[in-house]
Amino acid sequence: MMTRFSFIVPVFNRPDEVDELLQSLTRQTVRGFEVIVVEDGSQMPCRDVCEKYASQLDIHYFDKPNSGPGQSRNYGVERAQGEYVIILDSDVVLPDGYLAAVEQELQREPADAFGGPDSAHPSFTPTQKAISYSMTSFFTTGGIRGGKKKLDKFYPRSFNMGIRREVYEQLGGFSSMRFGEDIDFS
């Protein structure tokens, strides 16, 4: 049976953030997904963090020379088994029930690509919330990062993006550019 979801997490020098992300994945109620962590030439590797979750998650850790986020995402997708690949930045923390909500929505309305808003964690200080707002405001992101559920046109953002594997392959993956590498998905 094919895995339904593969989480792809490129990481560069963020072991603490990866720990928080993996912890959030252990709290998902939908099981049977895999996690592909791609270490992109870090000086602060997260191998030990990944090993800590090996009994709770189907996790695969890869260490490779630095090539940037796009190429690291492609590297992870090449090794993934999922029908859908969900690309997450290493500092993402998923809410409990994230994957159940994704599965429910895909059952209700099948889609080739999906994404989600980001929001400040309730524990953030006022300064952290202000920074988060400035980065997720409707005025700077077209609404999706500020919590709006629907847009007239969907522009997935690679920090929290799911895409059907066959569509990803048709697009040829991410560009090798170091910034703006997700432009082909817009």
Regions found by a protein language model. Give the residues of each.
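A recurrent flexible, glycine/aromatic-enriched loop bordering the glycosyltransferase active site
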Residues: 120, 141-162, 166, 175-180, ...
